[in-house]
């Protein structure tokens, strides 16, 4: 098993054909994955996914009650996980719909362990990369917002307290350290206090 899956990733298998589902469970278990749930239709897949919050879902496209693509859309509205879609059809439209729904990989039946396991590992790896990028984007957005607020507070201090830009920055920085607050909290306090005047 690759380094992406060394911590026994939790997997939900959703496949309406029992024999295929059992084969998938056996293959994934043999590859070191922890199969935490099995679903026979799309609605059950959604319910189990929301209850179990697996790292990965291996799901058939064509299932009773709700197709796999619709189930994937419902699941990904609520939780973050990697999804591998299974299908007997390799139509471009289905592949595009699955991708738009958030599927990280697409495996065409019939398939064997040599097809499924790499697809699962790639899906998990891509999901980890995407989550890391989303965290980085969030962090950068937070830092940008902090910088904007600190700049605004500096401007207010320069205008209202007759400080130079370096003096205003040092005052915010020193106040932050002295009061054990973030620079953003100090900047917000300055902005709020000036707004009240």
Model-derived segments and spans:
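Two-component/phosphorelay signaling modules centered on CheY-like receiver
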Residues: 17-37
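Active-site beta3 strand of CheY-like receiver
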Residues: 52-58
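Short amphipathic alpha-helix used as the core "switch/output" element in two-component signaling
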Residues: 47, 69-80
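C-terminal output helix
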Residues: 93, 111-120
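C-terminal output/effector regions of signal-responsive regulators
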Residues: 126-129, 135-197
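Active-site residues of response regulator receiver
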Residues: 60, 87
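Acidic catalytic/metal-coordinating carboxylates
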Residues: 41-44, 65-70
């Amino acid at each position: 098993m690759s380094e992406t899956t060394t911590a026994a990733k939790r997997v939900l298998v959703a496949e309406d054909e029992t024999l295929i589902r059992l084969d998938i469970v056996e293959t994934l278990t043999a590859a070191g994955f922890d199969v935490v749930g099995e679903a026979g239709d799309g609605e059950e897949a959604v319910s189990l996914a929301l209850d179990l919050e697996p790292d990965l879902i291996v799901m058939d496209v064509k299932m009773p009650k709700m197709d796999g693509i619709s189930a994937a859309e419902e699941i990904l509205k609520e939780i973050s996980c990697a999804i591998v879609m299974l299908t007997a059809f390799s139509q471009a439209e289905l592949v595009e719909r699955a991708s738009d729904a958030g599927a990280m990989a697409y495996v065409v039946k019939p398939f064997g362990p040599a097809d499924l396991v790499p697809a699962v590992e790639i899906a998990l790896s891509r999901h980890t990369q995407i989550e890391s990028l989303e965290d980085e984007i969030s962090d950068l957005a937070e830092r940008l917002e902090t910088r904007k607020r600190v700049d605004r507070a500096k401007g207010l201090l320069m205008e209202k307290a007759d400080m130079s830009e370096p003096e205003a920055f040092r005052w915010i920085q020193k106040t932050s350290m002295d009061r054990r607050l973030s620079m953003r909290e100090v900047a917000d306090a300055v902005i709020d206090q000036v707004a009240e005047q």
